[in-house]
Amino acid sequence: HPMIKPHVNSAAMTYDLACDPMYENLMTATSHLTGKKVNRFTHIHQSIEDLVNKVKMMRMIAQKTGTCFQRCVGFDAMNATFITTYNMDKKYGTNYHERFKKWMTYVQENDLMIAGAMTDVKGNRSLKPSKQADPDLFTHVVEKREDGVVICGAKAHMTGMANSHEMLILPTTNLLDGDQDYAIACAVPVDAEGITHIFGRQTNDQRRLQGDLDTGNSEYAIVGGETLTVLDHVFVPWDRVFMCGETDFAQDYVARFAAYHRQNYGGCKVGNSDVLIGATSMIAKMNGTRKNSLIKDKLTEMIHLAETMYCCSLACSYEGVKEEAGSYYVNTLLANEVKLNCTRNMYEIS
């Protein structure tokens, strides 16, 4: 469909570039689970180099698409889950980590696109999940069976969900005693029974019905094809459940995901900035104003702001550490600096 096609094209680039020898070093990695070459978007970070290459990869893809390519949220959710399941098993003697590794092997073998499903619709922000007027405002377990669990709720602003094979559901906030039903992490196919996806409106989306003229980034669109995903009594077998009731790990889980995700911004946002800066320079050239001192100052400032964001992402990657689980985790403080600079600099650049 013309209103969805650009987002499909953008996600497809994460597959096409992985098959291009020119970009193989950034787009692929060696799985520590199987020893095979896998798409980096399905990889669990095994070194500082992996963390750095993630940022460089994202800048490169963004330079080619000028938009969101949608696999980053799932990528970060998988890496956060790898650490969290290990830590839960260590404390409680559960078997989440082995389950997760088995599922990760399946994801890698099939190069699946995973949507990270964290953000709930939330309702009254002053109340914890178990105190909401409507229990479905946060995703939660409504039934435990011998063969699995049944969940209800909704996940909002789901980047890339419409193009993904599966979603990795995780908590969205710190949880307290009484919130056990909301401490759920699991993997679910996007077309499982009981799931409805509501595709969000996009800027100038109806113009695409008339062709490519005046539609902005007509090939790849401008955002990530977000959905509101409703979960209406969705069954999840136990071998796809990676947290169930461990409220004391929810906050750390969310924090790890957030740090990994903030690391990205100095990659993808800077790649998008590269496109904008290049276009601005070209427009100035066509108008005969590129040598004007004011224009040169503005372009220089745009480059400075973009490279500052990139430096922050590289810094939090190079300062990463090896976790007891065996994977590598970014420096949280510096990852937060990425976020702070990006939320300011992107607006100044544009």
Regions found by a protein language model. Name each.
Residues 19-114, 166:
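Internal helix-loop-helix
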Residues 86-93, 120-122, 297-301:
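Conserved short loop/turn motifs at secondary-structure junctions
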Residues 95-106, 221, 238-265, 281-304:
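Well-ordered, non-transmembrane segments within structured domains
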Residues 12, 101-108, 139, 146-148, ...:
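Short, well-ordered alpha-helical packing segments
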Residues 121-268:
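FAD-binding core of flavoproteins
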Residues 1-43, 50-61, 264-350:
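Alpha-helical interface subdomain recognition
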Residues 8, 75, 97-101, 135, ...:
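Alpha-helix initiation and N-capping motif
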